[in-house]
Regions:
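Beta-sheet entry/capping signal
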Residues: 89, 240-241, 286-289
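Active-site nucleophile/metal-coordination loop of metallo-enzymes that catalyze phosphate/sulfate
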Residues: 1-77, 91
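Generic, well-ordered alpha-helical scaffold segments in large soluble proteins
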Residues: 146, 150-154, 202, 206, ...
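Glycine-rich, mobile lid/loop segments that gate access to catalytic sites or pores
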Residues: 49-174
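Anion-binding catalytic surfaces of enzymes that hydrolyze or transfer phosphate/sulfate esters
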Residues: 174-260
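Active-site His/acidic residue clusters
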Residues: 46-48, 92-123, 233, 237-277
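Short, hydrophobic/amphipathic alpha-helical packing segments
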Residues: 62, 66, 137-148, 225-230, ...
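Metal-dependent active-site segment of extracytoplasmic phospho-/sulfohydrolases and closely related
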Residues: 1, 264-292
Length: 292
């Protein structure tokens, strides 16, 4: 929501949830009847959400688990699609977006059964070709429960301390309709987005920005700060606009690690902002930096 609003979009007109934006980032071609949801792989312990990331899975590990789930639970209506790390995609053909899902990072140490998907209160069916909100919620909850059995018995989890033992679908929507930044702001002729996160890349895709991927950009505290700022400077030499996104402090905050969050903010200041400012200060053409 915040990243879309920062770029100047009217959220009431364009926002469809994280799922459709992340689908664009991984080049999944959403169809008009698709419901796309973010699908976290999370860790449950003692019937509670222990964390929202399954012990910080790598993309390779996440892909292995998602492909296994798709083999066992996927069909013509249901697709599990690999994203990045613990962040993946669940597509339901004919699914209804008028449901209430709990973001797992907002509910650590809470009982998962109390957070299951619910139909949106007060919504009256208008799309006869789609499932009802209740049927959609029932299907998603069934997938959550089935995933727990499959993941608990997956060889990957049998000898791993942190258990990636449940899916958690949320933030679903339909294919969005967004103008490009160039259409919103004629002064911008070209631009790029730099991020390790599918959500931000997806926003950039719909905004008409080039998506720049940086080696070593992890979205965590160990990300390649220098590589990202170097890519931003190189893009600014050729283009009018660069959206540089650093995820590390957000992940540290969700983990409740104050020391790490402070360190990531220091890294942002000394390894990104300082380098960027010192470089562009020597340019003849003025550059505006907005730090948000």
């Amino acid at each position: 929501v915040a990243n879309t609003a920062i770029l100047g979009y009217d959220l009431n007109k364009v926002y469809e949830g994280r799922g459709p934006l992340e689908a664009a980032s991984i080049e999944y071609d959403m169809q008009p009847d698709d419901l796309a949801l973010r699908c976290n792989i999370i860790e449950l312990e003692d019937d509670c959400i222990k964390n929202h990331h399954g012990g910080h899975l790598t993309t390779e590990e996440g892909n292995m688990l998602i492909q296994s789930l798709n083999d066992k639970l996927g069909n013509e209506q249901i697709k599990f699609i690999t994203g990045i790390q613990y962040r993946h995609l669940l597509v339901i053909k004919g699914g209804n977006k008028h449901i209430t899902c709990a973001p797992p990072h907002d509910h650590p140490n809470e009982e998962w059964k109390s957070l299951l998907v619910q139909p949106e209160e007060g919504y009256h069916m208008k799309d006869d070709h789609r499932m009802s909100p209740q049927a959609t919620a029932n299907l998603l909850n069934e997938l959550i429960i089935k995933s727990q059995t499959l993941l608990a018995n997956h060889p990957f989890n049998l000898h791993r301390k942190a258990k990636a033992n449940s899916i958690w679908p949320w933030s679903g929507g339909y294919r969005p309709s967004m103008s490009t930044l160039m259409q919103l702001y004629p002064e911008i002729k070209s631009g790029s987005v730099i991020s390790a996160v599918d959500l931000i890349r997806g926003i950039g895709h719909y905004a008409g920005l080039d998506v720049i991927k940086v080696n070593g950009a992890t979205g965590l505290a160990d990300t390649n700060y220098e590589g990202k700022v170097k890519a931003a400077i190189e893009a600014l030499e050729k283009q009018d606009f660069v959206y540089l996104h650093i995820e590390a402090s957000d992940e540290a905050g969700h983990d409740g690690d104050l020391d790490l969050k402070l360190k990531t903010i220091e890294n942002l200041d000394t390894r990104v902002v300082k380098t960027l400012y010192e470089t562009i200060s020597n340019w003849q053409e003025p550059v505006c930096i907005a730090l948000l």
